[in-house]
């Protein structure tokens, strides 16, 4: 059952990542904003769910596997983030690379903290 939870969650997470990314890239084609939004919202969600599912509602392990390991594992894109960051550097877009790399990390840390805080309020 645990394997199925991770499989289903990962598939749905990957699909949502793809849909969000192509939607955002239509509006901001020259900056990897889609990946940045996905990684930062994923950071928020993992912070929120890590508290909410364990301390607020005490969700069963298979639900935690479905949402955190599965969905968020498929949804977040750290490997894509690093590849796109290197691509910006290789193209000589150093300022964009700086904003992208630093912005994703700073916002990611802040969103994990915010998610944990809000998850604890419920």
UniProtKB/Swiss-Prot annotation:
Na(+) is not transported, but it plays an essential structural role and its presence is essential for fluoride channel function. It is a multi-pass membrane protein. It is found in: Cell inner membrane. GO terms for molecular function: fluoride channel activity; metal ion binding. It catalyses: fluoride(in) = fluoride(out). Keywords: Cell inner membrane, Cell membrane, Ion channel, Ion transport, Membrane, Metal-binding, Sodium, Transmembrane, Transmembrane helix, Transport. Na(+) binds at residues 73, 76. This is Fluoride-specific ion channel FluC. It comes from Hydrogenobaculum sp. (strain Y04AAS1).
């Amino acid at each position: 059952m645990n394997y199925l939870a991770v499989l289903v969650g990962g598939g749905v997470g990957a699909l949502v990542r793809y849909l969000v990314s192509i939607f955002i890239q239509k509006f901001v084609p020259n900056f990897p904003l889609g990946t940045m939004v996905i990684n930062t919202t994923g950071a928020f969600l993992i912070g929120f769910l890590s508290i909410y599912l364990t301390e607020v509602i005490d969700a069963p392990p298979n639900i935690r596997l479905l949402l955190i390991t599965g969905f968020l594992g498929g949804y977040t894109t750290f490997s894509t983030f690093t590849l796109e960051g290197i691509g910006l550097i290789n193209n000589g877009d150093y300022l964009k690379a700086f904003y992208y790399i630093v912005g994703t990390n700073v916002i990611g840390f802040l969103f994990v903290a915010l998610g944990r805080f809000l998850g604890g309020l419920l």
